[in-house]
């Protein structure tokens, strides 16, 4: 594949930075740091353009916080100028990142996403009698910068641009020099998604294997027999160790497709997709909060209806009508909020 030439001047062009600024600010205009940047947008973008061309970007500042839903993760939020920089870069190179990936990779891609990944898993379970499911142990902290940069150099050229990517990696080395990507930045998402493309292609090259699905570091593929499943798993484990410096989590699964799989928070069966335990618990908690606010008079009926509409997003993409009715019955309701009485 011919490498794409990228210049710092292309990234720093004013229309590109304006578009990047709009993307980075979308939904965050009320944030103080974003509001300050936007209030002085012309000078801020001029300064960012100069920093890009003069090879002083990125700024490198980031705030760090921890979330616990669905599991403990350390999130690094880049300063707003760096978020604009990341969008400016991927305005230019996202199309090439798309061509790097197989069609069965679903994270951080337009027209893909979790729900399409879950439907692809269901199709795999319907077609193949066995499946393998694995995920990478400590994926983001384990990514080696030298291997990632080698991959990027095979796809892009331009000394200034590649040096910019290296500086971004250096600023986000979360596991010591030369290792780790920060969770929470646009660049990290694209880098991490591309880093496992070789593993995708390794799986798809195996005989008796198909129905491959990957959402970031959560992989599932179908197999014609248990023997093929075991062989493909052993091969992938060796490939990740030798070519990527990664290892799989101890909990890897080989099972008959008729047993179904849990994937991205859903319980996927050959004939139905159901919410997983965390999604159900999150929905129950949301309904309890809405009911408490309504009973105490803290929220109007319209506020409660809007909150209810938001809580339904937790269960989108799966068959959840029966579960919702059971939860609501526990609060004395026979109909969902907003439904007509007949």
What are the residue ranges of the model-derived segments?
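Short alpha-helical scaffolding segments that buttress acidic/His motifs in well-ordered protein cores
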Residues: 20-24, 88, 164-169
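Conserved polymerase palm-domain catalytic core
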Residues: 44, 50-52, 60, 70, ...
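Acidic (Asp/Glu) carboxylate-rich active-site/surface patches
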Residues: 112-113
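Non-catalytic, polymerase-adjacent accessory regions of viral genome-replication enzymes
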Residues: 1-46, 341-342
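Right-hand nucleic-acid polymerase module
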Residues: 78, 87, 171, 227-231, ...
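A common structural junction motif
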Residues: 237-246
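Active-site substrate-recognition loop segments, prototypically the cytochrome P450 B′-helix/B-C loop
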Residues: 26-108
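Short acidic (Asp/Glu) and glycine-rich catalytic loops that position anionic groups and cofactors
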Residues: 1, 23-29, 66-68, 98-99, ...
């Amino acid at each position: 594949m011919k490498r794409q030439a990228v210049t710092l001047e292309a990234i720093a062009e004013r229309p590109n930075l304006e578009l990047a600024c709009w993307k980075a600010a979308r939904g965050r205009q009320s944030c103080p740091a974003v509001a300050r940047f936007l209030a002085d947008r012309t000078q801020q973008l001029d300064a960012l353009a100069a920093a890009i061309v003069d090879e002083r970007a990125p700024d490198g500042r980031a705030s760090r916080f921890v979330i616990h839903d669905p599991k403990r993760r350390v999130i690094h939020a880049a300063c707003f100028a760096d978020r604009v920089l990341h969008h400016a870069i991927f305005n230019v190179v996202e199309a090439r990142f798309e061509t790097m990936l197989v069609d069965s990779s679903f994270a951080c891609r337009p027209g893909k996403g979790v729900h399409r990944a879950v439907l692809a898993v269901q199709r795999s379970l319907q077609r193949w009698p066995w499946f393998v499911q694995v995920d990478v142990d400590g994926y983001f902290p384990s990514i080696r910068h030298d291997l990632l940069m080698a991959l990027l150099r095979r796809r892009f050229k331009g000394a200034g641009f590649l040096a910019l990517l290296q500086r971004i990696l250096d600023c986000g080395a979360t596991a010591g020099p030369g290792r780790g990507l920060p969770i929470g930045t646009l660049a990290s998402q694209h880098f991490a998604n591309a880093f496992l493309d070789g593993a995708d292609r390794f799986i798809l090259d195996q005989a008796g294997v198909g129905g491959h699905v990957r959402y970031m570091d959560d992989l599932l593929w179908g197999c014609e027999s248990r023997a093929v499943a075991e062989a493909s798993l052993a091969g992938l484990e060796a490939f990740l160790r030798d070519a990527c410096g990664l290892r799989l989590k101890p909990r890897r699964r080989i099972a008959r497709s008729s047993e179904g799989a849990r994937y991205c928070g859903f319980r996927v069966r050959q004939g139905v997709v159901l919410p997983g335990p965390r999604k159900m618990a999150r929905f129950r908690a949301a309904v309890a909060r809405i009911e408490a606010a309504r009973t105490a008079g803290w929220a109007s009926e319209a506020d409660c209806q809007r909150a209810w509409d938001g809580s339904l997003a937790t269960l989108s993409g799966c068959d959840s009508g029966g579960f919702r009715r059971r939860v609501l019955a526990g609060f004395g309701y026979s109909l969902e909020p907003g439904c007509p009485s007949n």
